[in-house]
């Protein structure tokens, strides 16, 4: 690879690091080209899966201000640069790794810090942002309905008391 090509590749990878909301670093030793294509399809629009030389990736990470990933760049390494929801991409990679034992998750990077294998797996086990927001909204709606019932209860109790007193007076006057 010519020096100019390397500089271009480093700049491209650094740009991907900067634009990504998260990255997942994997080892793809033993996977076929068809397997890699299948993984890329499963990631869809949420992430791009890139295979690059470790030395170029290390330089690009340093250029992008990413620290703590150098030890992950050994052996055949590929990186998923996540543009969408990190949970969706992590789920897709974890599911693919479960089917294809050759794919090994090495770690990742999100919100300014390196992630361990366990942290990437925990992110994959989370529900998507939309599901969590829906659950939160449902919980809030239920609590708001209870609060409205509590606030309305004294008024309705007063109204029932007034109606009972009115009936009692009407009964006393009739007698």
Swiss-Prot record:
<keyword id="KW-0694">RNA-binding</keyword>
<dbReference type="GO" id="GO:0015934">
    <property type="term" value="C:large ribosomal subunit"/>
</dbReference>
<dbReference type="Pfam" id="PF00466">
    <property type="entry name" value="Ribosomal_L10"/>
</dbReference>
<dbReference type="InterPro" id="IPR002363">
    <property type="entry name" value="Ribosomal_uL10_CS_bac"/>
</dbReference>
<dbReference type="GO" id="GO:0070180">
    <property type="term" value="F:large ribosomal subunit rRNA binding"/>
</dbReference>
<keyword id="KW-0699">rRNA-binding</keyword>
<dbReference type="InterPro" id="IPR047865">
    <property type="entry name" value="Ribosomal_uL10_bac_type"/>
</dbReference>
<comment type="function">
    <text>Forms part of the ribosomal stalk, playing a central role in the interaction of the ribosome with GTP-bound translation factors.</text>
</comment>
<dbReference type="InterPro" id="IPR043141">
    <property type="entry name" value="Ribosomal_uL10-like_sf"/>
</dbReference>
<keyword id="KW-0687">Ribonucleoprotein</keyword>
<dbReference type="GO" id="GO:0003735">
    <property type="term" value="F:structural constituent of ribosome"/>
</dbReference>
<keyword id="KW-0689">Ribosomal protein</keyword>
<comment type="subunit">
    <text>Part of the ribosomal stalk of the 50S ribosomal subunit. The N-terminus interacts with L11 and the large rRNA to form the base of the stalk. The C-terminus forms an elongated spine to which L12 dimers bind in a sequential fashion forming a multimeric L10(L12)X complex.</text>
</comment>
<comment type="similarity">
    <text>Belongs to the universal ribosomal protein uL10 family.</text>
</comment>
<protein>
    <recommendedName>
        <fullName>Large ribosomal subunit protein uL10</fullName>
    </recommendedName>
</protein>
<dbReference type="InterPro" id="IPR022973">
    <property type="entry name" value="Ribosomal_uL10_bac"/>
</dbReference>
<dbReference type="InterPro" id="IPR001790">
    <property type="entry name" value="Ribosomal_uL10"/>
</dbReference>
<dbReference type="GO" id="GO:0006412">
    <property type="term" value="P:translation"/>
</dbReference>
């Amino acid at each position: 690879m010519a020096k100019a090509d390397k500089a271009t590749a480093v700049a491209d990878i650094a740009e991907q690091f900067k634009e990504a909301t998260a990255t997942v670093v994997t080892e793809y030793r033993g996977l076929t080209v068809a397997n890699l294509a299948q993984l890329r399809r499963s990631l869809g629009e949420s992430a791009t899966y890139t295979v690059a030389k470790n030395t170029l990736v290390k330089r690009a990470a340093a250029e992008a201000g990413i620290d703590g990933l150098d030890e992950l760049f050994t052996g055949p390494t590929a990186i998923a640069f996540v543009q969408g929801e990190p949970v969706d991409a992590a789920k897709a990679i974890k599911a693919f790794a479960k089917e294809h034992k050759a794919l090994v998750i090495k770690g990742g990077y999100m919100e300014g810090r390196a992630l361990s294998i366990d942290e990437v797996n925990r992110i994959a086990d989370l529900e998507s942002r939309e599901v969590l927001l829906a659950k939160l909204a449902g919980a809030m709606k239920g609590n708001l309905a209870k609060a409205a019932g509590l606030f309305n209860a004294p008024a309705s109790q007063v109204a029932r008391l007034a109606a009972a007193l009115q009936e009692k007076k009407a009964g006393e006057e009739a007698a």
